[in-house]
Amino acid sequence: MLLSIFTSLLVPKLLGVESYGYWQLFIFYSSYVGLFHFGLCDGVYLREGGCPRDKLDKRKVNSIFWCGIVYQLVFVVIATTFLLSNKNSSDRVIVLLSTAVVLIISNAYSFFGYLFQAINETRIFSYSVIIDRVSYIIPVLGLIIARNANFAYYILSYIFARSIALLFCIVKGWDILTSGFISIRQTLRETFDCIRVGCKLLFATLASMLILGVARFAIDSRWGIETFGKVSFALSLVTFIMQFLMQVSMVLFPALRQANSSERKKAYISISGILDTISPFVYVMYFPVMFVISSWLPQYKESMLYFALLLPICVFDGKMDMCCTTFFKVLRQEKKLLCINVMTLIISSVLTFISAWVFGSLYCVLIGMVSAVFLRNLFSEYMLNKDFEVKFSLTHFVCVLMSGLFILFAYLFETIIAFSLYIGALVVYAYFQRTSLCKLSTGVKRIMVGDKD
């Protein structure tokens, strides 16, 4: 995460606003390449979750992997042929062709990543993520030192890093790749079964991404690549925190799959309560980040107002990923998750259309994004609360209130005044939540002492 922050502060410093916009457009498109494995990775993750490596049917998994590579290669060849015959701007063609290349590499990498997490070898996946980040930052630092402002080279660095991470996963999964194959008929049947199981989760994930994605597509179309770049910069700051929470949720899944119903209920209540309690403190980080960005990247000062409006996404989407989505997967309620995400996507699309093409307001688009994410979290918690027979806590509503106060203060007042007002509100909040905070602090201390022992 620190490496991501480091590069995200350096790259926009060197690239112009337009070039940075194309770089962010590539990152944006690349985030959707997972659609084209059609749920294969998700299916393997769900079917093999909790199964140790020594009990894994390696020949079956190997056959499924190569079957997935073949049908994705066919799609990439068709897409590349179409792109080369089309008359788009050269910069957009570079972005789209690079995305086609990343599709194969990233989906192969994702297959191993999901598999390692499913068989409870999360450490290997974590190492691959570190290798990916380090392999990216080394060439990027070289480009920055050379003051190379061509976004295409940064895309090449991304592809290189993802390839190195894939190579690491191949080495760690070599026993699987050399285990042999099952028959073609069995391979097709097993692949189809994985897609059938995983497609609901895939489309739920896709709908989840499009809740924010439709707004980003609209911003690119309505306001152009420079505004898209500025909004994407603000979203990239939000994404740093989200990436950390997603890694935590991946670790929770295998453990919760093996827990009984009462243990799952206790875990749900605990995780939900902890996230509600600590979430208001997340907003404090806005003020030092605002100061640093305004000084280091004055051309992105406008992005910080966008960041203030978008920061609640960390709270609501973070809770969704770490708590709600994890428990929907554990309870095998992918269909329910899909319905919630599709319903929220429709709301997001309507809000985006009205904001962008009726009101013509970028700020309304951003507020619509946050509103959609909040509603998704609310719907999900309502469903899970019914399943576990628990009620919404008062802390949940206070968390929503603190989010509203933060946006109000950041939008209406100068930074120093907004900071003072929010700290005052946070002190009042901490006073009324002192019992919960003390329990949380005691729990953290016990964990730290236990680690030392």
Where are these regions (language model features)?
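Signature of the first transmembrane helix
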Residues: 1-39, 102, 199-220, 225, ...
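Alpha-helical transmembrane segments of multi-pass membrane proteins
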Residues: 31, 73-74, 88-112, 164, ...
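Helix-loop junctions and terminal segments of transmembrane helices
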Residues: 37-53, 238-275, 325-330
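Alpha-helical transmembrane segments of multi-pass membrane transport and lipid-handling proteins
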Residues: 42, 62-89, 142, 167, ...
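Membrane-interface junctions at transmembrane-helix termini in multi-pass inner-membrane proteins
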Residues: 105-131, 312-343, 382-388
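Hydrophobic alpha-helical transmembrane segments
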Residues: 127-176, 342-353, 361-383, 420-432
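Interhelical loop/hinge segments that connect adjacent transmembrane helices in multipass membrane
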Residues: 151-158, 167-212, 251, 255-265, ...
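Membrane-proximal transmembrane or re-entrant/amphipathic helices at the cytosolic face
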Residues: 410-453
